Amino acid sequence: MHNELIIREYKSSDKQAILNLLRLNTPGCFSPQEESDLVYFLENEIEYYFVLELGTQTVGSGGFNFSPDKTTGIISWDILHPDFQRKSLGSILLNHRIEKIREFKDVQTVIVRTSQLSYRFYEKQGFTLIEIVEDYWAPGFHLYKMAYTRWP
């Protein structure tokens, strides 16, 4: 099938495709300054990161990390190609990661750190806003910290 949806683990050879996804979402969802943060994450901080493919096209990516004590799962770097937003693919990718986090029995909560531009998506997925920090990511890009309410 040409339009088979696959979620697989990130490989270093995916880096350019992921950066291209970020650029397609800049400045609509991300600040231009965040590209260097993503590069650093992909090269140094990655714990679990996934690529969403539709057929042969990379249409999304996202991962998760843990707090130092391993009791909090942290959803990280959700990026979806603009042409594939609002088609449930972001929900599929998020749910995949939440199910993966459930495999870690020490996790007591799941959070996401997003912006005012994307927090409504997470609200619809069961996250509740717990903190706002203005201009956190860059001027005009505020931090919206949210906790998952459907845990465990």
Task: Map each language-model feature to its residues.
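Conserved acetyl-CoA-binding loop-helix of GNAT-fold acetyltransferases
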Residues: 80, 86-99
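Short hydrophobic/aromatic beta-strand element in the GNAT-like acyltransferase core
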Residues: 47-51, 61, 77, 111, ...
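Conserved catalytic-core motifs of GNAT/GCN5-like acyltransferases
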Residues: 109-113, 123, 128-145
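A conserved beta-turn-beta hairpin within the catalytic core of GNAT-like acetyltransferases
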Residues: 66-76, 85, 104, 140-142
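Active-site rim helix/loop that mediates acceptor-substrate recognition in acyltransferases
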Residues: 28-51, 63
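Short amphipathic alpha-helix that is part of the acyltransferase structural core
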Residues: 1-33, 53, 58
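Conserved beta-strand in the GNAT
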Residues: 51, 57-66, 72-79
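Residue-level recognition of the GNAT/N-acetyltransferase active site
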Residues: 11, 67, 81, 113-115
